[in-house]
Amino acid sequence: MKRFLLLFSLVSTAAGAPAGGDEFYISRSGNDAWSGKLAAPSTGKTDGPFRTLAGARDALRLAKEKGLLTAGATVNVRGGTYELEDTFTLTAEDSGSASGPVVWRAFRDERVFLSGGKPVTHFVRVTDPAVARRLRPAARAHVLVTDLRPNGIADYGEITPRGGPPLELFAGGRRMTVARYPNDGWARIADVPQSGDTLYNRGLEREKRYDGVPAGRHYGRITYDGKEPSRWMQGQEMYVHGYWTFDWSDSYQQIQSIDTARREITLRPPHHGYGYTKNQRFYFLNILEELDAPGEWYLDRKAGLLYFWPPAGIHDAEASVLAKPLVALEGCSWTRLEGISFVCGRREGVRIREGHDNTVSACVFSNLGGDAVAIEGGFHNGVVSCDVHDVGMGGILLKGGERKTLTPGGHYAENNHIHDYSTWLRTGQYAVVMDGVGHRVEHNLIHDSPFEGIAIRGNDMVIEYNEFHNLMKETGDAGAIHTGRDWTWRGNVIRYNYFHDLKGPGLHGVMGVYLDDWASGFTVTGNLFYRAGRATMIGGGRDNFVVNNIYVECSPSIHVDARGLGWASYYFDGTTNELFTKMDDMNYSRPPYSRRYPALLHMEDSTPAVPKYNTIIGNISYGGRWMDVYDYQAFDLSVVTIRNNVIADPVLLRRRKDGEKGWDPYYLDIDMKEGYVALPNGDTEAARTFQGNLILKGNPGVRAPERGDFSLIANSAAANLGFTPVPASEIGPRGK
């Protein structure tokens, strides 16, 4: 398995690919009045490269109008940082052709940065005694201040509950931290007062975690422990950021006031959609008094003053300013972007709308506020061999195709290294979003984020040969791959992926493949799961195939539930018709759906809430817990086909205790009184439940999964199962 992506080998592979047609050059020492045909200014400085991207684009347009560039063109961008005042946009008139693409690339091995930022300079010591008194004594000698307006920066953006980031500060190539308390980790909501003038959220009646209060119920106030806020000056623009009720949903909330005597915070509407719940995590931010560590900064938006404690040895700073994509391809086709770094913007690095056969390859996306690349519409657009990290939102959006006709969009993300993303919004952001029909994500390395890896929203997607690890590090009830709540999202294949070291602090744990809320018609095959939490979760859906996977030290390897018969029965009793409406929206009873997915014709039978026709065959599992079955008392597990698996886990089955009444609570580890039992390997009931499978103790023959070796030992029980070997050496990015 390839564990590391050596970016520069990929850059040289992609950016060094041959490009035909006329060659042009852009340089920081160029001039848009020149021909752009020289790589450097001529001796007499009468000709040379262009100076700007826009200048080169406009010159190419003129050449095409004259009938030139029929073989395409290559625009070589010389090294340096190019600050963009506005989005660099290419439209249909800038397109290449199949035989003559237009390539915009970094010249040879030179490093090219397209930046949406501005330098922040003119820092001085804090001399205002009123400000100095608010700083901690240890910070006063280190904190500097500058007026952003003479720096040419007047738009600071706004902090909104679920929007992208406003102005951010970078120094030494790293994102700096808005002054916060606590500096690391989280505070906890001490309580949520249950009285007031306005009840903003009635809460979730079925989930009462503490003191009999429905989760999320609030009157716009929370309380805190400790005395720290008593030091802070009221009236400054203070915020809190937290996971307010669920560990899969965060938001920023502005503080209206703090009653330090009662240790009570009144929050300014709009409030978090799921309310506020006792003991949930949060921290305070944008508080001058908490600017107390190197790398922290505070912005007084009213005065335009930025306060900063620079890290040792750092003398430069840059603020993100451009609140638009750095580069946009609008209806453009046969265009390639290669070997370029996109940095310091508040939104996407590259946005592609419509058009076809565009590629972004061997590029670096970092220190951005939005997604790295957003592809919306068009056909056959892709992102290849790019390094995406330290972006405020997600990595790559693949959106396209026509769902009603099942026409594929054919977008792809291949051979990318995507990590340390979702730095601003901590949930709802992904390494890759697949939306529409017929996209593929393959040979990527995805790791280290607070939330999930890939979201699937559509049909006929393929996710293969990817490695996922250390995801969901701050969250819970989340999966490395996540989908759900639409019966028509079918035909998706998840195969030959490696999931390992998945663990999060949040409620409900984390999953490898999360087929949430009745996701149906998925194939999960040939995957490797090592310490991957609840490795494969079937959340009430049907027609899913979980075949020929290896599970090691997972808890559990496979989860099956019938939530539609329990806590989520309101999806089937007429309270909401969401699932059925989505089927009608796709005209499921007529072609192409009736032919491609004939199982949909049976979804409205007499028992649509029962997880029928799931198939779990030929898997190997050991060292953890084989299966959790929730709502166990509500349905007959025999509707799920479970056979020919090698099961060697210490615990075979986790289910609700006999005699327990009511819905399965699904709470997991709140008060340890949930009424679940674990049936060990050797238990007679568990043996009966899983008859038709080979139940063993100890390693059944997987060679050395702790070292990433999942090959099967010859003549072992696992090998004799007839297991089809997983092509493990092909997993992850190609090239080292």
Could you describe each region identified by the protein language model?
Residues 25-354, 359, 366, 582, ...:
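Extracellular polysaccharide-degrading/modifying enzymes targeting complex plant/algal/animal polysaccharides
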Residues 97, 347-351, 369-376, 389-708:
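Glycine- and acidic/polar-rich repeat regions and solenoidal domains
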Residues 382:
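Core nucleic-acid recognition elements
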Residues 16-21:
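Boundary at the C-terminal end of the N-terminal hydrophobic targeting segment
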Residues 5-13:
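Bacterial N-terminal signal peptides
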